[in-house]
Regions:
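Flavin-dependent oxidoreductase catalytic cores
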Residues: 1-129
C-alpha cells in the first residue's frame, strides 16, 4: 500500500511535493525481518520516488539487528536519501552522536518537549550547555 501511495503522489504532475516515508521495523524483527529486507524495502521506496526517510524508534539511537547499530544508521547504510530522526531527543549529546554516525540530516523534536510551558527557554539552555 505504501508503494502505491508514493507512486500515485509522484505521478501527479500538479503536485510537486517531497515525499517522506515514516517507518519502524521493530515489530517486524520478531517475525524474521532482516537487514536485507530493510535494504529491499528502502530501494523499492526510493525507486518509487521517496525523497527522504524518517525511521522511527522510541529512542533515536535504539539498536536493532545483530550488530547493534541503530535503525537510523542501518537506513543510512542502505540509502543515500536524507534522513530525519526522532525519538526522545532531549540533549545536544544525542544530536552530536547521531551526526557523528552520519545517520541524521534533520532532527524532529520529541512531542514531550512541548509539554513544558517554557520549552523554548529549556531548549536554549540545553543547546548552550
Amino acid at each position: 500500500l505504501s508503494l502505491e501511495i508514493v507512486t500515485a503522489i509522484k505521478k501527479r504532475k500538479s503536485v510537486n511535493l517531497p515525499v517522506s516515508y515514516y517507518f519502524s521495523i521493530f515489530d517486524k524483527i520478531e517475525d524474521g525481518f532482516k537487514p536485507k529486507d530493510l535494504n529491499e524495502m528502502l530501494n523499492t521506496l526510493e525507486n518509487a520516488g521517496v525523497d527522504f526517510f524518517h525511521p522511527f524508534a522510541i529512542h533515536a539511537m535504539n539498536k536493532c539487528f545483530e550488530n547493534k547499530d541503530p535503525l537510523c544508521q542501518w537506513t543510512a547504510k542502505f540509502s543515500n536519501k536524507p534522513l530525519i530522526i526522532n525519538g526522545n531527543i532531549k540533549s545536544p549529546q544525542l544530536l552530536e552522536e547521531a551526526a557523528a554516525l552520519g545517520c541524521a540530516d534533520w532532527f524532529a523534536l520529541d512531542q514531550s518537549i512541548f509539554e513544558k510551558s517554557q520549552w523554548y527557554q529549556y531548549l536554549k539552555r540545553k543547546l548552550n550547555q
